[in-house]
Protein backbone atom coordinates (compact mmCIF):
# COMPACT_ATOMS: atom_id res chain seq x y z
CA UNK A 1 0.00 0.00 0.00
CA UNK A 2 2.91 2.34 -0.68
CA UNK A 3 0.81 3.98 -3.38
CA UNK A 4 -1.96 4.60 -0.86
CA UNK A 5 0.58 6.16 1.51
CA UNK A 6 1.47 8.59 -1.30
CA UNK A 7 -2.19 9.53 -1.79
CA UNK A 8 -3.24 7.17 -4.59
CA UNK A 9 -6.98 6.49 -4.35
CA UNK A 10 -9.42 4.06 -6.00
CA UNK A 11 -10.38 5.16 -9.49
CA UNK A 12 -7.11 6.95 -10.19
CA UNK A 13 -4.99 6.07 -13.20
CA UNK A 14 -1.30 5.15 -12.99
CA UNK A 15 0.90 5.33 -16.09
CA UNK A 16 3.47 2.55 -16.54
CA UNK A 17 6.31 2.94 -19.03
CA UNK A 18 9.23 0.64 -19.70
CA UNK A 19 10.31 -2.69 -21.12
CA UNK A 20 8.97 -5.97 -19.77
CA UNK A 21 10.24 -6.13 -16.18
CA UNK A 22 8.82 -7.95 -13.15
CA UNK A 23 8.30 -4.76 -11.12
CA UNK A 24 6.27 -3.22 -13.93
CA UNK A 25 3.88 -6.16 -13.95
CA UNK A 26 3.74 -6.17 -10.15
CA UNK A 27 2.73 -2.50 -10.35
CA UNK A 28 -0.10 -3.43 -12.72
CA UNK A 29 -1.40 -5.83 -10.07
CA UNK A 30 -0.82 -3.40 -7.20
CA UNK A 31 -2.71 -0.66 -9.04
CA UNK A 32 -5.62 -2.96 -9.82
CA UNK A 33 -5.67 -4.32 -6.26
CA UNK A 34 -6.07 -0.76 -4.99
CA UNK A 35 -8.95 -0.34 -7.46
CA UNK A 36 -6.91 1.95 -9.64
CA UNK A 37 -6.35 1.64 -13.38
CA UNK A 38 -2.97 1.04 -15.04
CA UNK A 39 -2.27 2.99 -18.22
CA UNK A 40 0.71 1.35 -19.98
CA UNK A 41 2.67 3.43 -22.47
CA UNK A 42 5.17 2.38 -25.12
CA UNK A 43 8.75 2.58 -23.86
CA UNK A 44 10.05 3.91 -27.18
CA UNK A 45 7.61 6.83 -27.24
CA UNK A 46 9.17 10.28 -27.10
CA UNK A 47 8.01 12.71 -24.44
CA UNK A 48 5.74 14.61 -26.81
CA UNK A 49 3.90 11.38 -27.68
CA UNK A 50 3.42 10.60 -24.00
CA UNK A 51 2.00 14.03 -23.15
CA UNK A 52 -1.41 13.47 -24.72
CA UNK A 53 -1.95 10.12 -23.00
CA UNK A 54 -0.88 11.46 -19.60
CA UNK A 55 -3.23 14.44 -19.88
CA UNK A 56 -6.12 12.50 -21.42
CA UNK A 57 -6.00 9.82 -18.71
CA UNK A 58 -5.55 12.48 -16.01
CA UNK A 59 -2.49 10.67 -14.67
CA UNK A 60 -1.05 11.84 -11.33
CA UNK A 61 1.16 8.79 -10.69
CA UNK A 62 3.60 7.07 -13.04
CA UNK A 63 5.98 4.14 -12.81
CA UNK A 64 9.08 4.47 -14.99
CA UNK A 65 11.48 1.62 -15.63
CA UNK A 66 14.67 3.66 -15.69
CA UNK A 67 16.42 7.01 -16.00
CA UNK A 68 15.48 7.37 -19.68
CA UNK A 69 11.77 7.11 -18.89
CA UNK A 70 12.08 9.31 -15.78
CA UNK A 71 13.75 12.03 -17.86
CA UNK A 72 10.83 12.03 -20.32
CA UNK A 73 8.29 12.29 -17.50
CA UNK A 74 10.21 15.06 -15.72
CA UNK A 75 10.47 16.95 -19.02
CA UNK A 76 6.70 16.84 -19.42
CA UNK A 77 6.04 17.79 -15.82
CA UNK A 78 8.24 20.89 -16.24
CA UNK A 79 6.91 21.78 -19.72
CA UNK A 80 4.60 24.66 -20.49
CA UNK A 81 1.93 24.96 -23.13
CA UNK A 82 0.58 22.01 -25.08
CA UNK A 83 3.17 19.52 -23.79
CA UNK A 84 2.65 20.37 -20.10
CA UNK A 85 1.49 17.62 -17.76
CA UNK A 86 1.27 19.54 -14.47
CA UNK A 87 -0.97 16.93 -12.84
CA UNK A 88 1.83 14.36 -12.82
CA UNK A 89 2.82 14.66 -9.16
CA UNK A 90 4.48 11.30 -8.42
CA UNK A 91 7.06 9.40 -10.47
CA UNK A 92 8.24 6.01 -9.22
CA UNK A 93 11.30 4.43 -10.81
CA UNK A 94 12.42 0.81 -10.84
CA UNK A 95 16.06 0.85 -11.96
CA UNK A 96 18.19 3.13 -9.73
CA UNK A 97 21.14 3.34 -12.15
CA UNK A 98 21.82 6.98 -12.97
CA UNK A 99 19.26 8.24 -10.44
CA UNK A 100 21.59 8.97 -7.50
CA UNK A 101 21.57 12.77 -7.91
CA UNK A 102 17.90 13.17 -8.83
CA UNK A 103 16.05 15.08 -6.09
CA UNK A 104 12.86 16.28 -7.77
CA UNK A 105 9.70 16.49 -5.65
CA UNK A 106 7.48 13.42 -5.95
CA UNK A 107 10.28 11.22 -7.32
CA UNK A 108 10.67 7.93 -5.42
CA UNK A 109 12.23 4.53 -6.07
CA UNK A 110 10.29 1.27 -6.06
CA UNK A 111 12.32 0.21 -3.02
CA UNK A 112 11.29 3.37 -1.15
CA UNK A 113 7.69 2.82 -2.24
CA UNK A 114 7.74 -0.72 -0.89
CA UNK A 115 9.14 0.50 2.45
CA UNK A 116 6.32 3.06 2.62
CA UNK A 117 3.88 0.27 1.86
CA UNK A 118 5.13 -1.94 4.66
CA UNK A 119 4.83 0.93 7.16
CA UNK A 120 1.35 1.83 5.86
CA UNK A 121 0.23 -1.79 6.11
CA UNK A 122 1.25 -1.93 9.77
CA UNK A 123 -0.99 1.08 10.44
CA UNK A 124 -3.86 -0.12 8.22
CA UNK A 125 -3.61 -3.93 8.17
CA UNK A 126 -7.04 -4.54 6.61
CA UNK A 127 -7.00 -1.84 3.91
CA UNK A 128 -5.48 -3.92 1.10
CA UNK A 129 -7.84 -6.88 1.64
CA UNK A 130 -10.83 -4.52 1.87
CA UNK A 131 -9.98 -2.81 -1.43
CA UNK A 132 -9.42 -6.12 -3.22
CA UNK A 133 -12.75 -7.44 -1.89
CA UNK A 134 -14.55 -4.36 -3.28
CA UNK A 135 -13.35 -5.06 -6.83
CA UNK A 136 -15.98 -6.00 -9.39
CA UNK A 137 -15.75 -7.84 -12.74
CA UNK A 138 -17.04 -4.76 -14.55
CA UNK A 139 -14.41 -2.44 -13.03
CA UNK A 140 -11.98 -1.04 -15.59
CA UNK A 141 -8.85 -3.23 -15.50
CA UNK A 142 -6.67 -1.16 -17.83
CA UNK A 143 -6.76 1.72 -20.29
CA UNK A 144 -4.89 0.81 -23.48
CA UNK A 145 -4.27 3.60 -25.98
CA UNK A 146 -4.48 3.10 -29.73
CA UNK A 147 -1.50 4.06 -31.87
CA UNK A 148 -3.07 7.26 -33.11
CA UNK A 149 -2.34 6.57 -36.78
CA UNK A 150 -5.72 8.02 -37.83
CA UNK A 151 -5.73 10.92 -35.40
CA UNK A 152 -5.18 11.30 -31.69
CA UNK A 153 -4.73 8.08 -29.71
CA UNK A 154 -7.90 6.83 -28.06
CA UNK A 155 -8.03 5.29 -24.61
CA UNK A 156 -9.79 1.92 -24.68
CA UNK A 157 -11.14 0.91 -21.28
CA UNK A 158 -11.11 -2.86 -20.74
CA UNK A 159 -12.85 -4.51 -17.79
CA UNK A 160 -11.58 -7.38 -15.68
CA UNK A 161 -14.43 -9.55 -17.02
CA UNK A 162 -13.45 -8.83 -20.63
CA UNK A 163 -9.83 -9.80 -20.00
CA UNK A 164 -10.73 -12.98 -18.15
CA UNK A 165 -12.99 -14.03 -21.04
CA UNK A 166 -10.27 -13.22 -23.60
CA UNK A 167 -7.61 -15.04 -21.58
CA UNK A 168 -9.80 -18.13 -21.36
CA UNK A 169 -10.32 -18.02 -25.11
CA UNK A 170 -6.59 -17.65 -25.71
CA UNK A 171 -5.77 -20.55 -23.40
CA UNK A 172 -8.30 -22.78 -25.16
CA UNK A 173 -7.19 -21.73 -28.65
CA UNK A 174 -3.49 -22.27 -27.92
CA UNK A 175 -4.11 -25.44 -25.93
CA UNK A 176 -2.26 -24.14 -22.87
CA UNK A 177 -2.29 -26.26 -19.73
CA UNK A 178 -1.36 -25.76 -16.09
CA UNK A 179 2.42 -25.75 -15.85
CA UNK A 180 2.99 -24.36 -19.36
CA UNK A 181 5.26 -21.32 -19.63
CA UNK A 182 4.43 -18.24 -21.68
CA UNK A 183 7.21 -15.80 -22.59
CA UNK A 184 6.07 -12.19 -22.46
CA UNK A 185 8.19 -10.24 -24.93
CA UNK A 186 5.83 -7.69 -26.46
CA UNK A 187 5.38 -4.15 -25.11
CA UNK A 188 3.15 -4.01 -22.00
CA UNK A 189 1.10 -1.28 -23.72
CA UNK A 190 -0.07 -3.73 -26.39
CA UNK A 191 -3.28 -5.61 -25.68
CA UNK A 192 -1.83 -9.02 -26.58
CA UNK A 193 1.00 -8.73 -24.07
CA UNK A 194 -1.35 -7.47 -21.39
CA UNK A 195 -3.68 -10.38 -22.02
CA UNK A 196 -1.04 -13.08 -21.53
CA UNK A 197 0.89 -11.33 -18.78
Predicted region positions:
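Conserved phosphate-binding and hydrolysis motifs of nucleotide-dependent enzymes
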Residues: 7, 11, 147-155, 159-160
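AMP-binding (ANL) adenylation modules
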Residues: 19-21, 186-190
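Structural core segment of the AMP-binding/adenylate-forming
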Residues: 5-6, 34-116
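Conserved structural elements of the adenylate-forming
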Residues: 1, 156-177, 195
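Conserved short alpha-helical elements in the N-terminal third of ANL/AMP-binding
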Residues: 30-36, 189-197
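Conserved AMP-binding/adenylate-forming
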Residues: 2-47
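Conserved pre-ATP/AMP-binding loop-to-beta segment of ANL
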Residues: 107-145, 152, 175-181
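Conserved S/T- and glycine-rich ATP-binding loop of Class I adenylate-forming
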Residues: 14, 31, 62, 140, ...
Amino acid sequence: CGLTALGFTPGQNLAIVGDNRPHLYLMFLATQSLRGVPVPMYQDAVATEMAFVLRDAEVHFALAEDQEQVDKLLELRAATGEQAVPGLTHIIYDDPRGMRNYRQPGLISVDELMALGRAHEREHPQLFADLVAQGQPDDVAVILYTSGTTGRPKGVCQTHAAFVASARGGVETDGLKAGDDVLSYLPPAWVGDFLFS
